[in-house]
């Protein structure tokens, strides 16, 4: 049996346009509505079955996100919910816990309840997973991705962060301040930033010391605390540290305090994201600001315009900013 995506592909319009046309929305012109209904009949699609199934999904947007425990994802969820509400959508949120199986199930669930649009926040590597890509292709809703860096599959709208330029800015800042022994800490989920860290160091002509790169399974402040403990146990620790994200930086600073050490006098600390706590700790954490508000605003605006027969997906890169505070 044909589905909404088949009709959309046949006519060269968005899935949301097909959905609204079949539901008799006044936002869709009479000519487009007739064209969609004719195509649905030709392909053997049951409009009556669709109306019954879609009732719960009318004017509903889905949000899929890995977790809500970290400040970064909690901020994105709140921003997305507020922006979608302002556009007249009610929202349904699903968590994946960074698991492929949970992501596939979440996408399938959103498709089954016929949400009109779906905002998925995930890492670029995760978004390239074959199971996840296939689930997105089967989904009956318009999809917007928010990812950590460039996403090569152009069939989906995507807002992505230019992580590379941000990390280069951060390392260059440390270099200009005279730091030479620069380390990096991360958890396994954010380990892609270590790869970029190494690339940035090489670009700037700096030496990467393998012993100064610490990765563990623990996340958040606890992960940062434990990784800093490892570095401080060395005979010669680094004189500056890039943390994969701000909550790890906060944990690293706690470990320094326990040893009566301070940033930047004993070790400079730089984070990534610019979460709320980064503005207050230690007089302010130097960090690479992720433009979350811009990301969500652009993403929701594009999703809302999907009903206007826009045919091609968009890939939009946003550059982060360096926020210099007292820890460097």
Question: Model features per residue range: what roles?
Answer:
Residues 1-57:
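N-terminal helix-turn-helix DNA-binding module of bacterial transcription factors
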Residues 121-169, 207, 247, 273-285:
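Flexible loop/hinge segments that line or gate small-molecule binding clefts
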Residues 168-204, 211, 314-327:
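An alpha-beta-alpha
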Residues 115-123, 144, 183-186, 235-245, ...:
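Periplasmic-binding protein-like
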């Amino acid at each position: 049996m044909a589905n909404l995506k088949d009709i959309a592909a046949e006519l060269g319009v968005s899935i949301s346009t097909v959905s609204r046309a079949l539901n008799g929305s006044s936002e869709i012109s009479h000519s487009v509505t007739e064209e969609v209904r004719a195509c649905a009949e030709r392909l053997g699609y049951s409009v009556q079955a669709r109306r019954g199934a879609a009732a719960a999904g009318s004017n509903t947007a889905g949000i899929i996100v890995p977790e809500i425990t970290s400040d970064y994802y909690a901020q994105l969820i709140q921003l997305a919910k507020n922006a979608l509400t302002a556009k007249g959508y009610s929202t349904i949120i699903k968590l994946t816990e960074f698991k492929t199986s949970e992501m596939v199930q979440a996408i399938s669930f959103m498709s089954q309840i016929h949400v009109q649009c779906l905002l998925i926040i995930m890492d670029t590597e995760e978004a390239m997973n074959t199971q996840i890509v296939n689930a997105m292709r089967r989904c009956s809703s318009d999809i917007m991705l928010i990812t950590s860096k460039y996403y090569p599959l152009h069939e989906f709208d995507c807002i992505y962060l230019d992580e590379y330029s941000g990390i280069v800015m951060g390392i260059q800042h440390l270099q200009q301040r005279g730091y030479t022994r620069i380390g990096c800490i991360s958890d396994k989920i954010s380990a892609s930033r270590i790869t970029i860290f190494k690339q940035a160091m090489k670009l700037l002509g700096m030496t990467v010391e393998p012993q100064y790169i610490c990765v563990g399974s623990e996340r958040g402040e606890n992960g940062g605390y434990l990784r800093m403990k490892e570095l401080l146990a060395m005979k010669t620790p680094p004189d500056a540290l890039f943390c994969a994200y701000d909550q790890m930086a906060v944990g690293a600073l706690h470990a320094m305090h326990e040893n009566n050490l301070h940033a930047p006098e004993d070790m400079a600390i730089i984070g990534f994201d610019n979460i709320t706590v980064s503005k207050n700790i230690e007089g302010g954490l130097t960090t690479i600001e992720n433009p979350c508000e811009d990301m969500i605003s652009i993403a929701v605006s594009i999703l809302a315009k999907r009903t206007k027969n826009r045919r091609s997906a968009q890939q939009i890169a946003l550059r982060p900013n360096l926020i210099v505070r007292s820890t460097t």
